[in-house]
């Protein structure tokens, strides 16, 4: 029988079948960034001082930003896009003649962030060097008008958000339709929700974390040391010097580039010509192809970025800390009113998926609307900027930003099988339901559609799925149902006690590694549990084994050879009943089917022999 819990695969072919990735597949949009003038940049200066989180203030600030699309009359279609450390306001092309943007695959007409109907705003961050106030600007308190340099105040992600809040007020935006960002941009959108819980309808945080882990902190410390010990750093006042700390900044960037890639990406990119590097004019080692590449990237970076800005922004990222425990993160997001979409990447070791799951676990415990996907990729942290991976996760963003009035969720076109119909009949209307191994979400959609109420689901009527196959995650999300990417073999730590009325395990029991642990978890999280499973004591299977002396096999539900079956376990109705008795649960209802014959089997007709499928609802008394 096919398991409801699918093996993790991408929406593309598996790595084994498609061969090694091409260098083009691994090309980040960072490669197209330059120091060219920002032709579509807009500027606004705020005369009032900006108090800073760690003390002091900036007497005035200038914000450089770009916009796409048209703001509607009530300002409800505005999307804030937040960039990473080395990004800028130029997130996307404005027309065919424009320079490439760093998120061209995501922002534009007809794209997931659709500028035909959304008004997109992307500001250069405070502390940056592409138009907004930063260390390279004149210090108004300096008697000779020198740049701030290293005297630029120590700012935080919170200060960056406050500057963006001034811009939002200036543009007349009271609430963002969404705040979207990756890496450091993800930190910004999370801080937006922390500081202003009702500031956005949707929060999209990509390849990010609630705080940096110690390894990531260590890389940033080394990068700042490389810059600040460069003999040309001059205490940060190098702007009027003939030479700048380009060596230190280049080394910092080289180090950063390594953290943005993965082992697989680096092997694919550099092993084919490991000992045949492309020679470039550089003082840096070029014995290997990776050395030539890093030298090129490091030197190129010095032409468009300021060393003091790198120090300032990397420190702001390192100081960012929404909490290192689930309880602290729950406190951080307790008042949030938005829905959340979190996306991580399997090979990202700078902001590993486990850190996104920390946020997801806190949001789930708070009963916030959240969808989470871990995208399988070999591109590392840079995946959020790579076209192939944008094509994978972009549809999730498109769904989250869908106009529910003009573009309702994908029509359900639901065709339930008999065990799903039986589950549907058991669950009372208005129940909150968690579906483990939810597949394409059709059972949850049927539960929702049966007694649909206008507006978003309430806590009482909460519907949520757990799934690992990315095509199923997308299909479930396209139905407008929250779903999180999670391996059931790890239990259900994201959920709190009695969080749902019903927890469903549909056609998945036979694929679970630790059956007893998962059943106990279902009874902890749900007040009631429902399981459906294939009965391996079914008459045809017995006959096949006894008559032919071969591993049991039958048409339809059991049509697998012994060597390719997805099943780990081979439960029978009698065995499952015995196990439930050992777990001291009360069986509420049982439904048995001979699906092959299209017949319902009554309890007194020996279902252990005559049924190929069982549905059992149960609960635990004296919890």
Curated annotation (Swiss-Prot):
Substrate binds at residues 253, 382. Pathway: Amino-acid biosynthesis; L-methionine biosynthesis via de novo pathway; O-acetyl-L-homoserine from L-homoserine: step 1/1. The keyword Acyltransferase applies. GO terms for biological process: methionine biosynthetic process. It is found in: Cytoplasm. Pfam families: Abhydrolase_1, MetW. The keyword Transferase applies. InterPro entries: AB_hydrolase_1, AB_hydrolase_fold, HAT_MetX-like, Methionine_synth_MetW, SAM-dependent_MTases_sf. Residues 1-30 are annotated as: Disordered. Its main location: cytoplasm. Keywords: Acyltransferase, Amino-acid biosynthesis, Cytoplasm, Methionine biosynthesis, Transferase. It is an enzyme of class 2 (transferase). Its EC number is 2.3.1.31. It catalyses: L-homoserine + acetyl-CoA = O-acetyl-L-homoserine + CoA. Residues 77-385 form the AB hydrolase-1 domain. SUPFAM superfamilies: alpha/beta-Hydrolases, S-adenosyl-L-methionine-dependent methyltransferases. Gene3D superfamilies: 1.10.1740.110, alpha/beta hydrolase, Vaccinia Virus protein VP39. The active site is at residues 183, 348, 381. Residues 417-619 are annotated as: MetW. One of its GO terms (molecular function) is homoserine O-acetyltransferase activity. One of its GO terms (cellular component) is cytoplasm. Homodimer. In the N-terminal section; belongs to the AB hydrolase superfamily. MetX family. In the C-terminal section; belongs to the MetW family. This is Bifunctional methionine biosynthesis protein MetXA/MetW. The lineage of its organism: Bacteria, Pseudomonadati, Planctomycetota, Planctomycetia, Pirellulales. The gene is metXA.
